[in-house]
């Protein structure tokens, strides 16, 4: 027997028992007559000790380095009261070693387990990094999350059905990872960005409750919280309304938070996309932050200040105010930093007004734009924003998107900087009624979610007549400012699907070439269906309290989509490329 107990499972009830432990040397203290070691496995750490009276095993112990892999046999002993370590789960006991087997000693480590290592070091030696208790705990939590999800899905009649990894490239927003076919020379498979079409086809096949915990792939420009391969909890249902789907999934997340964190999330509020953008400048609002944007275009449309009156009178303009309680104490340097910050989002500046004394008229206001605004205007602004003495007002005035993005980001930053955001709270919500389409930089329409999302309460003819104002029957679950899941009611009418493709500029020939199988399937009694997908990586981030998505993935990629440990991607064997009919063209470096 290599192991009778996990290290972290030992406690006072095991005193007097002989146990066999297998794990790694975590720390060593040589006190001359005794050598104390902490032995670690995935469940925790326990202290063992060697007595010099047993010369043979004492000699072996003297040769062991940190991270040596060993087997320990010994007797569990209660520590003296004065020696109890309350910082350790096993701190009431220790193990007197009677025998030791060295599976493998360890070379000098390239990582220092007692210090912060660079992320590059951690990713290069990931197998060592994962031995750290805090990393092991995150992956154990991830496993428990997936176990909970599987139980919940099984209890609610869902079937776990796998969908293909090698599939056809279809336009879903990001670039596909392509896999060349040796058998079909010159043709390529695509790795799925999501199982979207296959899960819809499963609904058409009669499997009315499907789920899958599945890898997805997107070849896109990466951010700190994105990975080229990521894991979804993918869900689809037939004969359920959007409200019923949301209730099912809300109950799952509610149960998950109780199971993992003993936190009751309560009933999730529902907010339209329009309300979220107006009040918070984001379609994934962090409701732990009490600050809100207040629209004031009607108050400022007649002032003699172009920065305000032009967007206030423009159809695509927006003028809004962010009131920060006690913000009048901000220094000019801090305000200048916020001005630079909103510039990242396209804002040309950041007007502000300190309300030093709300009862002193213009004399109680300090602002570089005060000369353009009279007392009546300021009185209206103060009333609209509920400002009081000691507050500061930040103004956003520009095109609607610029103001919404910049002021929404400023709201988050100020909330963090001034400790207004309650970091101990959990604030979930549903965001619904997204626009069906959005305009790209060239003014063309693209699907805000994906082209299989159903519009809300529209016929194909009505949608074609006014696509810009169409509302999608879509919904996102947001927790603490993170979109953890999103979905929609799907199109199940072939005419509606062709109409959406047409609005997106996909002609009939391309529709048949790219989606012919879907359009055919829609003709044969397709049921109404709806679903969504959760990001497992992001859920695990939230539950474990980390802000780095790489901490909850066993073997993640860098932000450059590389694996430092295996050195992937790598150059392919020339013979393999020849068999595939592929020639690699070297890109010329930009001068």
From Swiss-Prot:
It catalyses: tRNA(Asp) + L-aspartate + ATP = L-aspartyl-tRNA(Asp) + AMP + diphosphate. GO terms for molecular function: aspartate-tRNA ligase activity; ATP binding; nucleic acid binding. Its EC number is 6.1.1.12. Keywords: Aminoacyl-tRNA synthetase, ATP-binding, Cytoplasm, Ligase, Nucleotide-binding, Protein biosynthesis. ATP binds at residues 218-220, 227, 483, 535-538. Belongs to the class-II aminoacyl-tRNA synthetase family. Type 1 subfamily. This is Aspartate--tRNA ligase. It comes from Actinobacillus pleuropneumoniae serotype 7 (strain AP76). The lineage of its organism: Bacteria, Pseudomonadati, Pseudomonadota, Gammaproteobacteria, Pasteurellales. The gene is aspS.
